């Protein structure tokens, strides 16, 4: 009966479990206690390795006497849990032998089952499992001295490769959770399957008993003994004192070139690692394989030659986009060698440590392959360079980059390595420039070159600008000079305009402007925009000076050039070609009239109420305006009417030397007022342009001062009778609406 049940258990377990790979022969007998060294990552070019070191040093444990319940025979299954996480389980391993026990024997024999070749005995956590200590369970019959339980210790020269197996698939895709291989039993999540076995010869029955997640504590462990009989199940719990010397999980980086070990997680006092003994042994002889990430498990059901536990290796050669492959070959009875293709200089040292010379380069990757009894695993990491993407290609769920800086072929690993799958990258200068790649960066955006700061000069479609409309315009900061659509001004409307701060010179729609609307340089933060369908007419306004909070505006709907513009206010004579809009007034050219060449809508103060002359005298009786540019027609009395009123044709032939009656008093008062305003505006302009640095007025000071001088005693005959004075040419403002007569 006993042999039958034992064979049944073996058959059941054989259908579930894979065949593990045994350690190389040189790896046996080198590690005291539990030493599980997991290769977290390496950089073969720069010569450093990153390991996860799981250790647990145990002292001898004393077992108390177990009371036996009534019954002639009982089978015991002993499981010892000493872990922090679920996923460990006791189980009866294949290859175990039991010593028959006499029922009268006061003491049974304890036996620690050795593993046969090809069967896994020790525990191996998954990659990224950083808080677990995985013991190897032992089968104990009866009571008495159980001996020492060594976690992962190599016993009798034979041990199994630490192997984790998820029932769902080779990469842990199933529902297994944290299933691990313990003594030939597979655990899935919190459910532990325990194989039971009878020790007697009379009526022993055997059945698996599930145990829901019983876990012991560090220090004193609890062991469960389950007795299975024909009649009942009797559980007897015994206490055993287990003193754990040290246990924990550390991470360290080992640099073979300098023979140095850097602890990146943990403490030096707990780790007990020296580069002379254990580290080299771990590198050369322990369970270190290099393979593809994203799994803590080997392929279930794989052969012993190709079943390799993959871990993480990331190789980052700088400046070589295609040189990114590491091929590690696990030789039976030999050490693990990282051998780039085409570089035979990489080999094994005498003590089993891998020698990787500096300056070596890696060739193109190759897929997984298994040749001639050797398990060859190749893991490739692609590197993109020169295409706006930098950093590393992280492998696995917990990619925590380590940065490596080399100086003269010697490297020093940083202390930022923590748990998880560590993909290492080296930040070294490239061969093609001072390019330093930091780990974990995503796409790097390209910063394009910007033009002049916040400046735009835009000439839009279908623009036929007039000569000097906006050309040569100097616009101070915070202002915009705009010639809007369907503008047809006369020559020089906006040309040469000087606009002080806080003002805007605007020529509104439906006024046709003349050529050269835009040919000017815009200062910072301004635009000069000549918009669509602009056909300007030359020289409508020249050098308009708009005072604070005022605008010089030309109204739309200008009619034929034969009619003069009717200004609301007109300046005093001898303006020197400069239209001055006094305070509180606006210069407007009303609809229904377009100025003749040289006739400009100008701003002037309202006439004095003392003027009582006949309108017919001022207006005249002729509505036909000759095409002489020197004819000065004006509807002066229009200013006395309401703003929107129009007077049909209001031009008189004003010949030279003719004086209108009643204009003397009005002329005197207007001149005095204009002189005052001109002085104020001139001082204001000089102050504004002196502070802003844009430049002074376009006209020299003499042009402004002489005609407008308050103490000038000469009459206006000389000024208005002469054509050579104050730069009055065809392209400039001529506009005094009372003609060129002496006063």
From Swiss-Prot:
Entry superkingdom: Eukaryota
Subcellular localization(s) per the UniProt record: Secreted, Extracellular space, Extracellular matrix
UniProt family annotation: Belongs to the osteoregulin family.
Biased composition annotated in UniProt, kind: Polar residues: 129-141, 421-431
The name this protein goes by in its record: Ovocleidin-116
Signal sequence interval, chain numbering: 1-18
UniProt keyword Signal present: yes
Organism of derivation: Gallus gallus (Chicken)
Gene Ontology molecular function, alphabetical: extracellular matrix protein binding
Renumbered residue ranges of the record's region Disordered: 68-225, 333-356, 385-454, 505-534, 549-577, 628-649, 692-743
GO BP term (any one): biomineral tissue development
Disulphide linkage map: 31-42
Keywords: Disulfide bond, Extracellular matrix, Glycoprotein, Secreted, Signal
Biased composition (Low complexity): 402-420
């Amino acid at each position: 009966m006993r042999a039958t049940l034992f064979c049944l258990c073996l058959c059941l377990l054989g259908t579930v479990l894979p065949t593990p790979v045994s350690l190389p022969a040189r790896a046996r007998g080198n590690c005291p206690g539990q030493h599980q060294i997991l290769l977290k990552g390496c950089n073969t070019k720069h010569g450093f390795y990153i390991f996860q070191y799981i250790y647990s040093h145990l002292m001898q444990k004393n077992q108390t006497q177990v009371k036996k319940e009534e019954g002639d025979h009982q089978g015991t299954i002993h499981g010892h849990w000493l872990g922090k996480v679920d996923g460990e389980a006791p189980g009866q391993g294949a290859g175990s032998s039991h010593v028959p026990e006499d029922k009268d024997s006061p003491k049974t024999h304890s036996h620690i089952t050795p593993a046969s070749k090809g069967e896994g005995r020790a525990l191996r956590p998954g990659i990224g499992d950083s808080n677990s200590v995985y013991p190897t369970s032992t089968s104990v019959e009866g009571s008495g001295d159980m001996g020492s339980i060594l976690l992962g210790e190599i016993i009798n020269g034979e041990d199994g490769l630490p192997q984790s197996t998820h029932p769902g698939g080779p990469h842990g895709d199933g529902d297994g959770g944290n299933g691990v291989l313990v003594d030939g039993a597979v655990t899935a999540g919190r459910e532990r399957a325990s194989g039971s076995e009878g020790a007697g010869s009379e009526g022993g029955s055997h059945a698996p008993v599930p145990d829901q997640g019983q876990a012991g504590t560090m220090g004193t462990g609890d062991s469960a003994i389950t007795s299975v009989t024909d009649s009942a199940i009797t559980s007897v719990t015994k206490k055993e004192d287990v003193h754990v010397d040290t246990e924990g999980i550390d991470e360290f980086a080992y640099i073979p070139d300098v023979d140095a070990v850097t602890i990146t997680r943990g403490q030096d006092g707990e780790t007990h690692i020296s580069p002379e003994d254990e580290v080299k042994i771990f590198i050369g002889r322990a369970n270190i394989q290099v393979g593809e990430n994203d799994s803590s498990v080997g392929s279930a059901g794989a052969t012993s030659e190709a079943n390799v536990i993959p871990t993480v290796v990331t190789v980052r050669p700088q400046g070589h986009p295609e040189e990114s492959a590491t091929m590690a070959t696990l030789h039976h009875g030999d050490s693990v060698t990282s051998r780039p293709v085409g570089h035979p200089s990489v080999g094994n040292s005498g003590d089993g440590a891998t020698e990787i010379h500096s300056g070596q380069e890696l060739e193109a990757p190759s897929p997984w392959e298994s040749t001639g009894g050797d398990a060859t695993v190749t893991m490739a990491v692609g590197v993109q360079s020169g295409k706006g993407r930098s950093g590393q290609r992280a492998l696995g769920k917990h990619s925590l980059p380590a940065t490596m800086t080399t100086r003269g072929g010697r490297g020093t690993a940083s202390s930022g390595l923590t748990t998880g799958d560590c993909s290492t990258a080296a930040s070294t200068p490239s061969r093609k420039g001072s390019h330093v790649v930091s780990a974990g960066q995503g796409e790097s955006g390209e910063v394009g070159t910007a033009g002049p700061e916040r400046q735009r000069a835009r000439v839009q479609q279908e623009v036929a600008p007039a000569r000097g409309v906006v050309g040569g315009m100097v616009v101070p900061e915070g202002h915009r000079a705009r010639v809007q659509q369907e503008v047809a001004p006369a020559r020089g409307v906006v040309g040469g305009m000087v606009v002080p701060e806080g003002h805007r010179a605007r020529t509104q729609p439906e006024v046709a402007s003349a050529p050269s609307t835009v040919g000017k340089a815009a200062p910072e933060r301004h635009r000069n925009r000549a918009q669509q369908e602009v056909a300007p007419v030359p020289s409508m306004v020249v050098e308009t000076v708009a005072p604070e909070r005022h605008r010089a505006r030309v109204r739309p709907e200008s009619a034929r050039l034969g009619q003069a513009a009717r200004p609301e206010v007109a300046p005093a004579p001898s303006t020197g070609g400069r239209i001055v809009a006094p305070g509180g007034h606006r210069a407007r050219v009303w609809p229904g009239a377009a100025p003749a060449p040289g006739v400009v809508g100008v701003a002037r103060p309202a006439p004095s109420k003392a003027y009582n002359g006949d309108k017919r005298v001022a207006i005249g009786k002729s509505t036909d305006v000759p095409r002489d540019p020197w004819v000065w027609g004006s509807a002066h009395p229009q200013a006395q009417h309401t703003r929107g009123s129009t007077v049909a044709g209001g031009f008189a032939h004003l010949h030279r030397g003719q004086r209108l009656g009643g204009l003397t008093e009005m002329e005197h008062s207007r001149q005095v007022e204009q002189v005052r305003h001109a002085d104020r505006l001139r001082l204001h302009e000089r102050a504004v342009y002196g502070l802003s640095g844009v430049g002074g007025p376009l006209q020299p000071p003499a042009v402004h001062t002489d005609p407008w001088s308050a103490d000038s005693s000469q009459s206006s005959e000389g000024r208005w009778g002469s054509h050579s004075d104050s730069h009055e040419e065809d392209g400039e403002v001529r506009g005094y609406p009372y003609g060129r007569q002496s006063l």
